[in-house]
UniProtKB/Swiss-Prot annotation:
Homodimer. It comes from Brucella abortus biovar 1 (strain 9-941). Residues 2-217 form the Glutamine amidotransferase type-2 domain. It is found in: Cytoplasm. Keywords: Aminotransferase, Cytoplasm, Glutamine amidotransferase, Repeat, Transferase. Its main location: cytoplasm. This is Glutamine--fructose-6-phosphate aminotransferase [isomerizing]. Residues 283-422, 455-597 form the SIS domain. One of its GO terms (cellular component) is cytosol. The lineage of its organism: Bacteria, Pseudomonadati, Pseudomonadota, Alphaproteobacteria, Hyphomicrobiales. It catalyses: D-fructose 6-phosphate + L-glutamine = D-glucosamine 6-phosphate + L-glutamate.
Length: 607
């Protein structure tokens, strides 16, 4: 969600802050700003909208100084306008914040009763005034922040800059991630390693309750009990090449075309294609002792989890619950200690998913995670971590992270099946071989981009779209609908095809496109029956199938997208591509901001 950067160094800081903020754009934002110290005096520049507006402001009104903080804001409290943008300042400090201060109304009422004037609608301004209040009592900046943190309820990552002190940055974390970066005679704070990549690859992640005091020469970290602690220092894998779109129009398009390569890398991490076996050393879980699996996630990751449910149940004969994290965490679900709790998150910082993990951990369950950021909080709090080797995903709408999540969990399903005796060695080799072929089939689908883009001219003119699928194509239908909603802003819904007669069929008329995901598998004839019901009511069908399915459908369609024939096991990996491309090219035709769609954030670090 919001992005934070803080730098204390020896070079002009404003351009460095803006550079870092550009790397945080993928998180989603609606305004931006920076503050610096020069000769002990605080100054700031803010702008509504994109960073280019802030850059224009800085071109006319430069901000000198070698220490500063910056922020990209995703509005939670207060409208997305300049006066609500961060940093917020008082006569004594500047502060930036990612998260939600749940008791801000109570704090604001108390501070206003003391005569303090609020200029914004944000929860963050209450933090600025609260710390200023302690400074005015004669406390040092370190003492003031330390004494205020226990009074803040909710989720927050904070960075402070203090009037008159060019040797000090303070950061604090409770919920949203915050990393410390180590340089030569300079130090950094950032929401993630990507923001810090131009400056350092040496970082530490603060844990919940930590607060950090940075000078040019190093950092002192304290836990929630104000005891000095050390956090592991690690090398970040992110590099400066990450911000390039290459020859592609958008990051999303680039990331779609990266899928064959990153899926290959992810699969090779778990499977030995030479022997046709699972790499047991990469698994770290004894599935023979697991009697039930709970997979919990949000958004696109939840749809990946739901596909995986089919795999684990059908191949490994392992009962699975797939849950939306924001619901699971409040259900107070009874859990067996012989269950395995698995959590899926691209960022590894998704707030509801992390809270669900901690609930399961408190119940004594073994914790596994499928994450794309191996240094993330979810990864650090897991007993077993299964990385998706997708590389950084900049587009807000997930593409390659989704298919890499599928790849990792497909591999785990084979491992579970073998460990539980549900398949023999020959079947294991068959399934591993099928997965090894997935990147080749995906490359064939990518060559259909122009054909798929042509279908989108009609899609871009409608207001509603229905997606249908059966089996593993049902969660793909939900994912396809989500993609279209996210980036084209067209209302779309994904349904199990067998549910058509239980309500959605009432929506069908000649204005309603219905996208049907229907590989010619054992469920194909059932899906054809549903298509006939749509056609009988004038619905316009876009059929995504293979050659065999296209030849046997005998139904007039608005368009038919013919994919290569693939084994049922890997069809979700292959059929994910056309639903991504349909959403992408529809959004391009509609002129939306594909990589940073309105109101959305890449990493949802608050409830």
């Amino acid at each position: 969600m919001c992005g934070i950067i803080g730098i204390i160094g020896n070079d002009e800081v404003a351009p460095r802050l803006v550079d870092a903020l550009k790397r945080l754009e993928y998180r989603g934002y609606d305004s931006a700003g920076i503050a610096t110290l020069q000769n002990g005096r605080l100054d700031r520049r803010r702008a509504e909208g994109k960073l280019v507006n802030l850059e224009k402001r800085l071109a006319g009104e430069p901000l000198p100084g070698v220490i500063g903080i910056g922020h990209t804001r995703w509005a939670t409290h207060g409208r997305p306008v300049e006066h609500n943008a961060h940093p917020h300042i008082t006569t004594r400090l500047a502060v930036v914040h990612n998260g939600i201060i749940e008791n801000f109304a109570e704090l604001r009422a108390m501070l206003e009763a003391e005569g303090r004037k609020f200029e914004t609608e944000t929860d963050t301004e209450a933090v600025a005034h609260l710390v200023t209040r302690e400074l005015e009592k004669g406390k040092s900046p370190v003492e003031a922040v330390r004494d205020c943190l226990p009074h803040l309820k909710g989720a927050f990552a904070l960075a402070f800059l203090f009037e008159g002190d060019e040797e000090l940055l303070i950061g604090a974390r409770q919920g949203p991630p915050l990393a410390v970066g180590y340089g030569e005679g300079e130090m950094f704070l950032g929401s993630d390693a990507i923001a810090l990549a131009p400056f350092t690859d040496t970082i530490s992640y603060l844990e919940d309750g930590d607060w950090a005091v940075l000078t040019r020469n190093g950092v002192s970290i304290y836990d929630e009990n104000n005891k000095p602690v050390e956090r592991p220092v690690q090398k970040s894998q992110n590099t400066n090449m990450l911000v390039s779109k290459g020859n592609h129009r958008h990051f999303m398009q680039k990331e779609m075309f990266e899928q064959p390569e990153v899926i290959s890398h992810t699969l090779a991490n778990y499977l030995d294609f030479t022997t046709g076996k699972v790499r047991k050393e990469a698994i770290g879980i004894d599935f023979s002792k697991v009697d039930r699996l709970t997979i919990t996630a949000c958004g696109t990751a939840y749809y990946a989890a739901t596909v995986a449910k089919y795999w684990f149940e059908q191949i490994a004969r392992l009962p699975v619950d797939s849950d939306i994290a924001s619901e699971f965490r409040y259900r107070e679900m009874p859990l067996s200690k012989d269950s395995l709790a698995m959590f899926v998150s691209q960022s590894g910082e998704t707030a509801d998913t992390l809270a669900s993990l901690r609930y399961c951990k408190a119940q004594g369950l073994k914790i596994a995670s499928v994450v794309n950021v191996t240094g993330s909080t979810i990864a650090r709090e897991s007993d077993a971590v299964f990385p998706t080797l997708a590389g950084p995903e900049i587009g807000v709408a997930s593409t390659k992270a989704f298919t890499c999540q599928l790849s990792a969990m497909a591999s785990l399903a084979i491992a579970a099946a073998r460990a539980r005796g549900a398949i023999d060695e020959v079947r294991e080799q068959e399934l591993v071989h099928q997965l090894s072929e997935a990147p080749r089939f995906i490359n064939q689908v990518l060559k259909l981009e122009d054909q798929i883009a042509a279908v989108c001219h009609d899609l871009s003119k409608v207001n509603h779209v229905l997606y249908l699928g059966r089996g593993t194509s049902f969660p793909l239908a939900m994912e396809g609908a989500l993609k279209l909603k996210e980036i084209s802003y067209i209302h779309a819904e994904g349904y199990a095809a067998g549910e058509l007669k239980h309500g959605p069929i009432a929506l069908i008329d000649e204005t309603m496109p219905v996208i049907v995901i229907a590989p010619s598998d054992r469920l194909y004839e059932k899906t054809v029956s549903n298509m006939q019901e749509v056609a009988a009511r004038g619905g316009r069908i876009i059929l995504i199938t293979d050659k065999k399915g296209a030849e046997s459908a005998s139904i007039d369609t608005m368009a038919t997208i013919v994919l290569p024939e693939v084994p049922e096991f890997i069809s979700p990996l292959v059929y994910a591509l056309p639903i991504q491309m349909l959403a992408y090219h529809t959004a391009v035709l509609m002129g939306t901001d594909v990589d940073q769609p309105r109101n959305l954030a890449k990493s949802v670090t608050v409830e």
